[in-house]
From Swiss-Prot:
It comes from Rhodospirillum centenum (strain ATCC 51521 / SW). One of its GO terms (cellular component) is cytoplasm. It comes from the Bacteria. This is Holliday junction branch migration complex subunit RuvA. The gene is ruvA. Its main location: cytoplasm. Residues 1-64 are annotated as: Domain I.
Length: 206
């Protein structure tokens, strides 16, 4: 198992890089985010890697950091998400944006990635919504309505209502969710919906 490559960058393409390690060139598939962070050809690079072995192929996938690698592993546990789609998601959204998008159940954000349609996005949201807490996301209950479409009672309900209000004002769900959860942590459980909306708007102001 190859877990890390350290060598000289030979060349790059739209979704790959070749790393020269002791005179051997390793072809590594990578996200656009990782490729942007690489040094110039001829300079030293270091990539964390995942190696997939099949009957007729060996593939290496490279990552700039452990967070992106861990997201790749998690995404590929979802049915219908192969390595290519996982890298497309990591190209379209940073790990932090992925975390917040899934916690906020923001299907539109996931559909920015090539190869991700509404049905696959919904499956990703459903299968990973309980797992994003390990990546530092707020509890999913804060972003979703209760049974029958009503927001849950208590602080989570106030957060959900405030997020919905900001979305109705034209903000993207993921940015509304991120802003409201940030101010909810500062204001505490006594904050009402109107308090969260006002503070959320200030958080979103440039």
């Amino acid at each position: 198992m190859i877990a890390k490559l350290t060598g000289l960058l030979d060349s790059t393409g739209l979704d790959w890089a070749i790393v020269d390690v002791g005179g051997v060139g390793y072809l590594v598939s990578a996200s656009a985010r990782t490729l942007r962070r690489l040094a110039a050809p001829g300079e030293a690079v270091s990539l964390l890697t995942e190696m997939w072995v099949s009957e007729d192929n060996i593939q290496l996938f490279g990552f700039a950091d452990t967070e992106e690698r861990d997201w790749f592993r998690l995404l590929t546990t979802v049915q219908g998400v192969g390595a290519r789609v996982a890298l497309n998601l990591l190209s379209a959204l940073s790990p932090a944006e992925l975390t917040n998008s899934i916690a906020a159940q923001d299907r539109t954000a996931l559909c920015q990635a090539d190869g991700v349609g509404p049905k696959l996005a919904a499956r990703i949201l459903n299968e990973l919504k309980e797992k994003v807490a390990s990546f530092g996301a707020p509890a999913p209950a804060a972003a979703t309505a209760g049974k029958g479409g009503a927001a849950p009672a208590g602080p989570a309900g106030a957060v959900a209502d405030a997020v919905s209000a900001l979305v109705n004002l034209g903000y993207r769900r993921v940015e509304a969710f991120t802003a409201v959860n940030a101010v909810a942590q500062r204001l505490g459980p006594e904050a009402g919906v109107s308090d969260l909306i006002r503070a959320g708007l200030k958080e979103l102001s440039p």
